[in-house]
Amino acid sequence: MHQLLRALLGGLALLLACGPLTVFGAETSRVPGGDADAALGAVFKDIEQSRLGSALEKVDALLVGYPNFRLAHLIRGDLLLARTRPLVSFGNSQDAPADKLADLREEAIARLKAYRNRPPSNYVPRYLLQMEPEQKYAIVVDTQRSRLYIYQNDNGRPRFVADYYITHGKLGAEKAREGDKRTPVGVYHVTANLPRQKLSDFYGSGAFPISYPNEWDRQQGRDGHGIWLHGTPSDTYSRPPRASDGCVVLTNRDLDALSSYLQIGLTPVIISNTIEWLSVDDWASERRSLNNQIEDWRKDWESRDVDRYLAHYSKNFRNSEGGYEQWARQKRLVTASKNWVKVDLGKLSVFRSPGKQDLIVVTFEQD
């Protein structure tokens, strides 16, 4: 039966050969919990165990709920064809273009990998060091795995809520230029909610623009605009993993579910090439270390010892008014004019930015 798997899914057979599939819930002809990934997992398990009739029933049930799911249609066609003759390739339609079949194979692999390898409950993305109290949820995207994860702010600790298949840029991640068909990597926020009625059908059930380019992007000379989380056209259930012009694309059902977690102007959207995971203990240790550094900076500011305060800044520091020398001169003048300094930091958030640079994004309200 592994020969059939190779024919159905090509390289996916190697993934299945690594160990048995675990499919949650009782086996039934209904789609488990309305979850397309769970349903596909059940189909693949049936194929692995030579239960082709059961696999076909599950695909048929899946297509009742998701009639525009092209990958499911292709698997159904192969399962029907397998009744009459051996399969020699994934997608045995004479009319299907090779590039379209490759896209569907890539989607199948991405969905099954994500379904089989959910993050352990005692691990969290390294980036979510501290959400401010008003931020109820955070979004983390892994472009290599074609996956979006939702985490809840549980008294400061991120707790896994849900994850969804996504499409990203045709040419990958690390956007640098307008029109480069790449998805940006960094720390962003949802900036608006664009309802379906104001958009063309291409964007599906709606769109949520994000804050690309951010301050760091602009300092690095990156440009471009119009990076959104959005849905799919009405005649399409999902798109291949690498098919957008840079946006993060979800199925319409998944975007509708995601929308209930988004707070305009507040929800962080952290996009990575591949997520770094930390155990809860290691995450807590890294969080303490960074919060201690922030507290040292705050105390040194209050101390009016300008040299100690400036020691926290790189000589390459820049803001909208200039570089380090201008900043240092201004701080010395301001501090000399004060008899005391009181610094209170509210609504503190701390996010590690993915990517090659060791960059931490800290925001707060100063009182």
Where are these regions (language model features)?
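Alpha-helical segment of the N-proximal tetratricopeptide repeat
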Residues: P32-A61, G65, D296-K299
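Gly/Pro-biased beta-strand-loop elements
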Residues: R116-W228, T232-S238
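Exported/periplasmic cell-wall-interacting domains
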Residues: A192-E295
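Short, well-ordered alpha-helical segments enriched in acidic and aromatic residues
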Residues: S303-N316, S320
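Surface-exposed, charged secondary-structure patches
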Residues: Q330-D367
